Structure formats: C-alpha cells, structure tokens
C-alpha cells in the first residue's frame, strides 16, 4: 500500500509520499521537498561535516538541513548547525531507527504528549530517514532561548547519564513559569518513555525554552526512541535513576518520584487508565507504520509487558 510518510494513511492515485495537507504541515508547502542525497552520499557528507565540527551533538547521527524553495527549487540541503530541520539517517548499528523514532513520536501524540513536528522522508535511493523541525529558531531564523538539563543543572555533556529524574523534576519546579503543569507533563512523558521502551532519556533529552522570549517552559518532546526493541541486550529500563534505580521498575517507583516533586497520585492514575484504554489505537498506529512485521511484533509485546507491570500495582 502506498502510504503517507507523515500520517501513515493511504495516498490517493497520483500522490507520492505525502498528502498535500501533510506536506504543508511539515514543510509549509503542499509540495514536499526533494531529498537529493542517497544513503551513501549522506554518510559521506556527514563524515565531512563531522570533520569540520558542525554536526549536531548526540550519539545518533544528525544533520542540519535548510529548505530551499526559490527559483523553482524545492530541495532540502545540508547546512552547518542552524538549519530549519534536523535529519537522522539509517544507521548500520541499529536497523529501522528512523521508523522506530517516528512511530514512537506518533504514539506520544496519541497519548496527548506535545511533540516537535516530525516525519519520515525518502532519500534519493528510496531509503527512509527521520526529519524534525527545529524549535529553537523562529521562522525568520532568530534564536529562541532553549537550555537542556545538562545546562540547567550545570553538568558537562559527558555527565548526561549521571543524575536522577527527581532532580529534573525539582529543576523544572525551580525554573519553569508553569511549574506545576510542566512537572505533571514531565512525569507523564517519563511514564510514556518507560511504556515505549525508551531507556535513553538523559539530561540532554529534556529542555526548557522561551517561545515568547520571556517565560521558560518545558519544551515539546523530542528524541523519543524505543531503544529496547532494537537493543534488547541493554537491560536498563531508564537512562537516569528513578527512586534510586534504572531497572525492575514498578508503578510505586513512579508514584514515589511524583510525590517528591509535588504531583498528586490521582493525576497519574487517571492518565495511565486512559492510556491503557487507548492501547488498541496505539497498536493500530504501529500496524500502519513503516516498521517491519518483526519489529511491529516486538513493539506490541513490549507495550503489553510494560502496561501489565504498571497496572497490576494500581
């Protein structure tokens, strides 16, 4: 079936990769841009950019892109650090990483979690990559103040795994202009990450930003990846400690952490119950995704196991 790379729904005859309305949401035009690079060319360009130290930080390869939509051109081109979009290609180490990240971001949307704009996009050789719109720049290119929790807790990047989620919650409480709402949203995002096998949400994967230029608030979720199904050898369930541990987590551990940062138990209970009722929709989204059948089955099994573990203690 010919499906949209943005919403996963079927395309009409004559449409290619995107519905016009989906392309407009992601790229500002009903005509999706070209990605004029093959995977091998992207690897070569990425190596060049890394040598000039203009790559974006993080373990997963990331490239900064600009949309050139003038003089009849409609292409995404690789730039230095401050492009409009961030692109993540396929990797040799972990298969289907772009597809996994994109569907996990879709699940976050179904869960009511605010995320950055995102989509899959096809390269010139037909392979798929993941693309997201930056939120630390305005449409005119002006910088929006944004700090991750390495910066906010004054830790160097190499210490991004040396902290706790309780520390993040207390830092949100200290700096956010919407501290109670953002603490709740942070805890819900953390529970979602556990349910979806994301054990790589370290200090740099949460941020505060100031879209109005004055007030710092929790940034939309980004870098949501089900690491557990692509790297089952890693038995840790979270990147940082929660209630003093990273694995064998229970619902009680989340409630204990929530209590420390002032979140009522009832708020979390209500949301978990709603998510469990919505699990068939989550699985339907995975079924519609671009994952292989094997990877879809792994995702279903992990969701079932994690939901069972949390709800049995309610």
Residue positions per predicted region:
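Regulatory N- and C-terminal appendages and interdomain linkers associated
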Residues: 1-50, 216, 260, 284-314
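Conserved ATP-binding subdomain of kinase catalytic cores across diverse folds
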Residues: 42-162, 218, 266
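A residue-level signal for conserved active-site and pocket-lining positions in enzyme catalytic cores
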Residues: 65, 108, 149, 200, ...
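Active-site activation/catalytic loop segments of kinase-like enzymes and analogous catalytic loops
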Residues: 65, 226, 230-248
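Conserved kinase catalytic-core segment
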Residues: 93-109, 164-230
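ATP-dependent phospho-/nucleotidyl transfer catalytic cores
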Residues: 124, 129-195, 240-244, 256, ...
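C-terminal regulatory or interaction extensions
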Residues: 143-144, 150, 225-233, 262-264
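Mobile late-domain/C-terminal helix-loop "cap" segments
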Residues: 243-304, 310
């Amino acid at each position: 079936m010919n499906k949209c790379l943005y919403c996963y729904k079927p395309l009409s005859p004559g449409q290619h990769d995107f519905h016009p309305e989906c392309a407009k949401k992601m790229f500002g035009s009903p005509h999706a841009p070209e990605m004029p690079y093959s995977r091998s060319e992207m690897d070569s360009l990425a190596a060049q950019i890394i040598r000039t130290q203009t790559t974006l930080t993080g373990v997963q390869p990331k490239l900064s892109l600009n949309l050139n939509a003038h003089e009849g051109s409609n292409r995404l081109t690789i730039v230095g650090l401050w492009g409009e979009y961030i692109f993540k290609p396929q990797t040799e180490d972990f298969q289907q990483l772009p597809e996994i990240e994109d569907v996990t971001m879709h699940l976050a949307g179904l869960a009511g979690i605010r995320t950055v704009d995102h989509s899959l996009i096809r390269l010139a050789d037909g392979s798929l990559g993941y693309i997201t719109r930056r939120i630390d720049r305005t449409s005119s290119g002006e910088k929006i103040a944004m700090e991750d929790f390495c910066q906010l807790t004054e830790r160097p990047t190499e210490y991004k795994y040396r902290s706790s989620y309780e520390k993040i919650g207390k830092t949100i409480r200290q700096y956010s202009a919407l501290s109670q709402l953002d603490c709740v949203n942070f805890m819900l995002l953390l529970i979602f990450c556990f349910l979806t096998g994301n054990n790589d949400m370290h200090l740099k994967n949460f941020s505060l930003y100031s879209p109005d230029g004055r007030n710092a608030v929790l940034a939309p979720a980004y870098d949501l990846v089900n690491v557990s199904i692509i790297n089952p050898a890693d038995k840790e369930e979270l990147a940082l400690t929660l209630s003093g541990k990273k694995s064998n987590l229970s619902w009680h551990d989340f409630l204990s952490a929530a209590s420390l940062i002032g979140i009522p138990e009832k708020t979390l209970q209500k949301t978990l119950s709603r998510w469990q009722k919505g699990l068939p929709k989550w699985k339907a989204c995975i079924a519609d995704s671009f994952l292989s059948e094997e990877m879809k089955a792994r995702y279903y099994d992990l969701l079932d196991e994690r939901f069972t573990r949390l709800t049995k203690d309610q």
